[in-house]
Amino acid sequence: CVSLTLKDHRQKNIILIGDSGAGKSETLEALRQVASDYVVDMTTIFDDMGTLLIEDNVMKAYGTEIGAFVRTDDLENGYTYKVFDRAIFMNPSLSNARIVLPISSYDDITTGINIDYILYANNYEESANKIRLFDNVASALEVFKKGARVAKGTTGETGLVTTFFANPFGPVQLEEETNVLLDKYFKYFFDNDIKVGEIYTGLALENGAENPIYAATELLKKLKED
Protein backbone atom coordinates (compact mmCIF):
# COMPACT_ATOMS: atom_id res chain seq x y z
CA CYS A 1 0.00 0.00 0.00
CA VAL A 2 1.41 3.37 -0.98
CA SER A 3 0.17 6.89 -0.39
CA LEU A 4 0.93 9.42 -3.13
CA THR A 5 0.77 13.18 -2.76
CA LEU A 6 0.34 14.80 -6.16
CA LYS A 7 1.67 18.23 -7.05
CA ASP A 8 -1.88 19.59 -6.99
CA HIS A 9 -1.97 18.50 -3.30
CA ARG A 10 -4.43 15.64 -3.87
CA GLN A 11 -3.67 12.37 -2.11
CA LYS A 12 -4.12 9.01 -3.84
CA ASN A 13 -3.77 5.75 -1.96
CA ILE A 14 -3.26 2.41 -3.68
CA ILE A 15 -3.18 -1.22 -2.55
CA LEU A 16 -1.60 -3.85 -4.79
CA ILE A 17 -2.44 -7.47 -3.96
CA GLY A 18 -0.61 -10.52 -5.29
CA ASP A 19 1.59 -13.38 -4.19
CA SER A 20 5.38 -13.43 -4.35
CA GLY A 21 6.79 -12.46 -7.74
CA ALA A 22 3.56 -10.95 -9.07
CA GLY A 23 5.25 -7.64 -9.82
CA LYS A 24 3.98 -5.48 -6.96
CA SER A 25 7.35 -4.07 -5.91
CA GLU A 26 8.50 -3.66 -9.50
CA THR A 27 5.36 -1.75 -10.47
CA LEU A 28 5.59 0.56 -7.47
CA GLU A 29 9.25 1.24 -8.18
CA ALA A 30 8.34 1.95 -11.81
CA LEU A 31 5.60 4.29 -10.61
CA ARG A 32 8.17 6.15 -8.53
CA GLN A 33 10.21 6.70 -11.69
CA VAL A 34 7.45 7.71 -14.13
CA ALA A 35 5.61 9.87 -11.60
CA SER A 36 8.55 12.01 -10.52
CA ASP A 37 7.19 15.08 -12.35
CA TYR A 38 3.70 14.72 -10.87
CA VAL A 39 4.21 13.33 -7.37
CA VAL A 40 5.86 15.19 -4.49
CA ASP A 41 5.76 12.34 -1.97
CA MET A 42 5.34 8.56 -2.05
CA THR A 43 4.98 6.89 1.34
CA THR A 44 4.77 3.15 1.94
CA ILE A 45 2.01 2.35 4.43
CA PHE A 46 2.60 -1.37 4.36
CA ASP A 47 4.88 -3.63 2.38
CA ASP A 48 3.59 -7.13 3.17
CA MET A 49 1.20 -7.02 6.09
CA GLY A 50 -1.58 -4.47 6.26
CA THR A 51 -4.93 -4.11 7.96
CA LEU A 52 -8.21 -2.67 6.69
CA LEU A 53 -10.65 -1.65 9.41
CA ILE A 54 -14.23 -0.44 9.01
CA GLU A 55 -15.31 1.74 11.93
CA ASP A 56 -18.51 3.80 11.87
CA ASN A 57 -18.82 2.83 8.19
CA VAL A 58 -15.45 4.41 7.36
CA MET A 59 -12.64 2.18 6.16
CA LYS A 60 -9.02 2.98 6.94
CA ALA A 61 -5.81 1.18 5.99
CA TYR A 62 -3.03 0.66 8.53
CA GLY A 63 0.43 -0.82 8.30
CA THR A 64 1.97 -3.33 10.67
CA GLU A 65 5.67 -2.83 10.07
CA ILE A 66 7.99 0.12 9.50
CA GLY A 67 10.46 -1.93 7.48
CA ALA A 68 10.44 -4.02 4.33
CA PHE A 69 11.82 -7.47 3.51
CA VAL A 70 12.41 -7.15 -0.22
CA ARG A 71 14.35 -8.79 -3.02
CA THR A 72 17.43 -6.82 -4.01
CA ASP A 73 16.51 -7.50 -7.65
CA ASP A 74 13.36 -5.42 -7.13
CA LEU A 75 15.29 -2.29 -6.20
CA GLU A 76 16.75 0.32 -8.52
CA ASN A 77 20.43 -0.08 -9.38
CA GLY A 78 22.64 1.19 -6.60
CA TYR A 79 19.85 1.53 -4.05
CA THR A 80 21.29 -1.10 -1.71
CA TYR A 81 24.52 0.89 -1.46
CA LYS A 82 22.61 4.00 -0.42
CA VAL A 83 21.09 2.18 2.57
CA PHE A 84 24.10 -0.01 3.35
CA ASP A 85 24.57 1.52 6.82
CA ARG A 86 20.98 0.92 7.97
CA ALA A 87 20.01 -2.33 6.25
CA ILE A 88 20.38 -6.03 6.94
CA PHE A 89 21.39 -8.17 3.95
CA MET A 90 20.38 -11.82 3.52
CA ASN A 91 22.31 -14.23 1.23
CA PRO A 92 23.56 -11.34 -0.96
CA SER A 93 25.63 -13.64 -3.18
CA LEU A 94 22.74 -15.95 -4.09
CA SER A 95 19.67 -15.67 -6.30
CA ASN A 96 16.56 -14.27 -4.59
CA ALA A 97 18.79 -12.23 -2.26
CA ARG A 98 16.88 -10.23 0.34
CA ILE A 99 17.36 -7.03 2.27
CA VAL A 100 15.62 -5.72 5.39
CA LEU A 101 15.42 -1.93 5.46
CA PRO A 102 13.38 0.81 7.13
CA ILE A 103 10.87 2.46 4.81
CA SER A 104 8.27 4.26 6.95
CA SER A 105 7.73 5.91 10.30
CA TYR A 106 5.47 4.64 13.06
CA ASP A 107 3.17 7.64 12.52
CA ASP A 108 2.87 6.79 8.82
CA ILE A 109 1.60 3.28 9.43
CA THR A 110 -0.69 3.98 12.39
CA THR A 111 -2.55 7.12 11.28
CA GLY A 112 -4.97 5.28 8.97
CA ILE A 113 -5.64 6.36 5.38
CA ASN A 114 -8.51 6.13 2.92
CA ILE A 115 -8.07 3.89 -0.12
CA ASP A 116 -8.72 4.90 -3.74
CA TYR A 117 -7.57 1.82 -5.68
CA ILE A 118 -7.28 -1.89 -4.86
CA LEU A 119 -5.60 -3.75 -7.71
CA TYR A 120 -4.68 -7.40 -8.23
CA ALA A 121 -1.20 -7.83 -9.74
CA ASN A 122 -1.41 -10.10 -12.80
CA ASN A 123 2.07 -11.08 -13.98
CA TYR A 124 1.21 -13.69 -16.62
CA GLU A 125 -1.43 -12.33 -19.02
CA GLU A 126 -0.85 -9.90 -21.86
CA SER A 127 -3.24 -6.97 -22.17
CA ALA A 128 -3.21 -3.83 -24.29
CA ASN A 129 -4.92 -2.01 -21.42
CA LYS A 130 -2.72 -2.43 -18.38
CA ILE A 131 -5.52 -1.74 -15.91
CA ARG A 132 -8.94 -3.39 -15.92
CA LEU A 133 -11.54 -2.16 -13.44
CA PHE A 134 -14.31 -4.48 -12.27
CA ASP A 135 -17.92 -3.33 -12.21
CA ASN A 136 -19.26 -5.86 -9.70
CA VAL A 137 -18.25 -7.78 -6.60
CA ALA A 138 -18.52 -11.26 -8.12
CA SER A 139 -16.10 -10.56 -10.98
CA ALA A 140 -13.59 -8.99 -8.63
CA LEU A 141 -13.74 -11.80 -6.08
CA GLU A 142 -13.26 -14.42 -8.78
CA VAL A 143 -9.86 -12.95 -9.66
CA PHE A 144 -8.72 -12.06 -6.15
CA LYS A 145 -9.73 -15.42 -4.66
CA LYS A 146 -8.08 -17.40 -7.46
CA GLY A 147 -4.75 -15.74 -6.68
CA ALA A 148 -3.07 -16.80 -9.93
CA ARG A 149 0.48 -15.98 -10.95
CA VAL A 150 3.45 -17.48 -12.75
CA ALA A 151 6.12 -18.33 -10.18
CA LYS A 152 9.26 -16.24 -10.66
CA GLY A 153 11.75 -18.18 -8.54
CA THR A 154 10.97 -16.30 -5.33
CA THR A 155 9.52 -19.52 -3.87
CA GLY A 156 9.92 -23.23 -4.59
CA GLU A 157 6.96 -23.17 -6.99
CA THR A 158 7.17 -23.32 -10.78
CA GLY A 159 4.81 -22.44 -13.62
CA LEU A 160 1.29 -21.06 -13.29
CA VAL A 161 0.13 -21.51 -9.71
CA THR A 162 -2.85 -20.39 -7.64
CA THR A 163 -3.15 -19.59 -3.95
CA PHE A 164 -6.43 -18.66 -2.30
CA PHE A 165 -6.52 -14.85 -2.08
CA ALA A 166 -2.86 -14.83 -3.14
CA ASN A 167 -1.76 -15.46 0.43
CA PRO A 168 -0.48 -18.78 1.85
CA PHE A 169 -0.45 -17.42 5.41
CA GLY A 170 -3.97 -17.31 6.85
CA PRO A 171 -6.61 -17.33 4.10
CA VAL A 172 -5.65 -20.84 2.96
CA GLN A 173 -5.89 -22.20 6.49
CA LEU A 174 -9.08 -20.30 7.36
CA GLU A 175 -10.89 -20.20 4.02
CA GLU A 176 -14.42 -20.18 5.43
CA GLU A 177 -13.73 -17.29 7.79
CA THR A 178 -11.83 -15.42 5.06
CA ASN A 179 -14.78 -15.71 2.66
CA VAL A 180 -17.01 -13.93 5.18
CA LEU A 181 -14.55 -11.03 5.41
CA LEU A 182 -14.02 -10.86 1.65
CA ASP A 183 -17.76 -10.65 0.97
CA LYS A 184 -18.11 -7.87 3.54
CA TYR A 185 -15.13 -5.81 2.44
CA PHE A 186 -15.56 -6.12 -1.32
CA LYS A 187 -19.19 -5.06 -0.96
CA TYR A 188 -17.93 -2.03 0.97
CA PHE A 189 -15.42 -1.23 -1.79
CA PHE A 190 -18.09 -1.09 -4.48
CA ASP A 191 -20.68 0.64 -2.30
CA ASN A 192 -18.17 3.40 -1.52
CA ASP A 193 -16.69 3.97 -4.98
CA ILE A 194 -13.31 2.44 -4.24
CA LYS A 195 -11.92 1.31 -7.58
CA VAL A 196 -11.23 -2.43 -7.69
CA GLY A 197 -9.36 -3.92 -10.59
CA GLU A 198 -6.47 -5.83 -12.07
CA ILE A 199 -3.12 -4.38 -13.09
CA TYR A 200 -1.17 -6.29 -15.73
CA THR A 201 2.44 -6.11 -14.55
CA GLY A 202 3.63 -8.56 -17.23
CA LEU A 203 6.58 -9.55 -15.06
CA ALA A 204 6.47 -13.21 -16.15
CA LEU A 205 6.17 -12.41 -19.85
CA GLU A 206 8.96 -11.90 -22.38
CA ASN A 207 11.02 -8.82 -21.48
CA GLY A 208 9.24 -8.93 -18.14
CA ALA A 209 11.57 -6.50 -16.42
CA GLU A 210 10.41 -3.72 -18.77
CA ASN A 211 6.67 -4.36 -18.50
CA PRO A 212 5.95 -2.80 -15.08
CA ILE A 213 6.86 0.58 -16.58
CA TYR A 214 3.86 0.33 -18.91
CA ALA A 215 1.56 -0.68 -16.06
CA ALA A 216 2.83 2.16 -13.89
CA THR A 217 2.39 4.68 -16.71
CA GLU A 218 -1.26 3.72 -17.17
CA LEU A 219 -1.85 3.80 -13.42
CA LEU A 220 -0.40 7.31 -13.23
CA LYS A 221 -2.66 8.40 -16.07
CA LYS A 222 -5.73 7.19 -14.18
CA LEU A 223 -4.61 8.90 -10.98
CA LYS A 224 -4.20 12.20 -12.81
CA GLU A 225 -7.62 11.87 -14.47
CA ASP A 226 -9.54 11.14 -11.25
Mark where each language-model region is:
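Conserved nucleotide-sensing/catalytic segment adjacent to the nucleotide-binding pocket
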Residues: 39-108
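Conserved NTP phosphate-binding and transfer environment spanning the P-loop NTPase/kinase superfamily
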Residues: 93-226
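An acidic- and aromatic-residue-enriched active-site/binding cleft used to recognize and process polar
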Residues: 7, 19-21, 33, 47-50, ...
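N-terminal pre-Walker A segment at the start of P-loop NTPase domains
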Residues: 1-7
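Hydrophobic/aromatic beta-strand patches that form the interior of the parallel beta-sheet core
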Residues: 14, 43-45, 62, 117-119, ...
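Glycine-rich phosphate-binding P-loop
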Residues: 9-36
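Short, surface-exposed amphipathic charged segments that create phosphate/polyanion-binding patches used
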Residues: 8-9, 58-61, 211-219
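Flexible loop/turn segments at secondary-structure boundaries
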Residues: 22-25, 51-54, 69-70, 125-128, ...
